[in-house]
């Protein structure tokens, strides 16, 4: 059987970033920049005050005969406006935070270091000498014209949104979101709103995968369930090929009714269909026509784990990401992993930072049908191939799915 690493490499070799498009800034969150972003002007575009206070010449703040200098207040400037006159020797202007520094002034003293008879007084005493540039934010201090601010391939988060807005990008060049078809298979599968009947199970996988696809940044399309007939699968695949990626659950094992691989071979190709891992050995990859297809196992835990290992990196590459994989950390496994499994074993666990190290505890029964083992899981402990056991208190690698708050 193929290793996890080889399977992932073969899958990703067939995946390309999708075409670029322009989206409104308000819709760019989570997408990937399709070009470098270069500042077209200085930010801030003008020198402005970092404090409420007075704009003056720094030399006018020096004491005179041991006494605080007294300056005439000739006006004021608020944020959003410009001064209608210059500051000259012996004069000053009131200034608000963010307001442009008036011509002639080379420093700003905060109001707390001044003294006036009343807020509207025409005279102010300067109680402390201040150097040139004090409390002034120079034009271009944050970004200067011609500077590359964001790089192609950067993911757009809330802070990037703020920077793009500051630079005036109302529409943003991005790699477009993938549209992903999600298809359940099997005569035994019914929808979630149907009453359970003997021999039937609810279509939990399609809803789980829909949510996982959305969290990965793509747009999911649930296509329902294909029955265990060639005709039903062909009909569903005809609908699915309008999308960028097809993800199925079930139908890729070795049973008489596991037909997905056969239809893949008929309408496209099968690259591989078994991986040396648990849970999730029966994973298939290939295509229907020119659309890549990732066939995940029918057991819900297997579908969830294999999506994290293979489906999520595929979507991230389609989105234009260059960092595709979840991070791994070294953990101490408090309760150990005693089951001997010859395949690579991904054990559901909860990892937290405790006493200067990452500590992991497994989430109970690790059967591939035990969906409750996915609850309170934020990591997968990686147990190497070959029947390796991890003793209680032993060390292992863990693939982090989320980072717990502290």
Residue ranges and their predicted role:
Residues 1-4, 8, 21, 25, ...:
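Generic structural signal for well-ordered, non-membrane alpha-helical segments
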């Amino acid at each position: 059987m193929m290793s996890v690493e080889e399977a992932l490499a073969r899958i990703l070799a067939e995946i390309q970033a999708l075409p670029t498009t322009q989206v409104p800034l308000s819709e760019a969150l989570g997408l990937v920049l399709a070009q470098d972003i270069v500042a077209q002007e200085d930010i801030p575009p003008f020198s402005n005050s970092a404090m409420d206070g007075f704009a003056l010449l720094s030399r006018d703040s020096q004491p005179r005969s041991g006494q605080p200098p007294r300056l005439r207040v000739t006006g004021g400037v608020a944020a959003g406006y410009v001064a209608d006159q210059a500051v000259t020797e012996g004069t000053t202007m009131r200034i608000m935070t963010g307001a442009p520094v008036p011509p002639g002034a080379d420093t700003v003293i905060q109001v707390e270091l001044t003294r006036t008879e009343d807020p509207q007084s025409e005279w102010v005493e300067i109680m402390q000498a201040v150097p040139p540039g004090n409390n002034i934010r120079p034009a271009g201090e944050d970004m200067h014209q011609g500077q590359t601010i964001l790089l192609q391939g950067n993911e757009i988060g809330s802070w990037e949104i703020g920077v793009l807005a500051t630079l005036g990008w109302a529409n943003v060049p991005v790699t477009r979101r993938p549209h992903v078809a999600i298809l359940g298979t099997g005569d035994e599968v019914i929808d979630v709103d149907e009453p359970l009947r003997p021999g039937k199970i609810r279509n939990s996988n399609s809803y789980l995968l829909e949510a996982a696809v959305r969290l990965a940044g793509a747009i999911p399309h649930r296509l329902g369930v294909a029955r265990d007939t060639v005709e039903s699968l062909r009909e569903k695949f005809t609908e699915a090929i309008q999308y960028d990626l097809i993800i199925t659950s079930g139908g890729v094992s070795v049973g008489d009714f596991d037909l997905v691989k056969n239809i893949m071979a008929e309408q496209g190709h099968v690259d591989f269909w078994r991986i040396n891992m648990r849970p999730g050995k029966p994973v298939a990859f290939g295509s229907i026509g020119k659309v890549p297809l990732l066939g995940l196992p029918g057991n819900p835990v297997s579908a969830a784990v294999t999506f994290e290992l293979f489906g999520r990196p595929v979507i991230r590459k389609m989105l234009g990401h260059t960092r595709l994989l979840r991070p791994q950390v070294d953990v101490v496994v408090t309760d150990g992993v005693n089951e001997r499994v010859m395949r690579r074993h991904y054990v559901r666990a909860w990892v937290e930072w405790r006493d200067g190290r990452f500590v992991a505890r497994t989430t109970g029964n690790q059967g591939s049908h035990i969906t409750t083992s996915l609850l309170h899981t934020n990591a997968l402990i990686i147990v190497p191939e070959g029947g390796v056991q991890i003793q209680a208190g032993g060390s292992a690698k863990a693939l982090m799915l989320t980072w717990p708050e502290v």
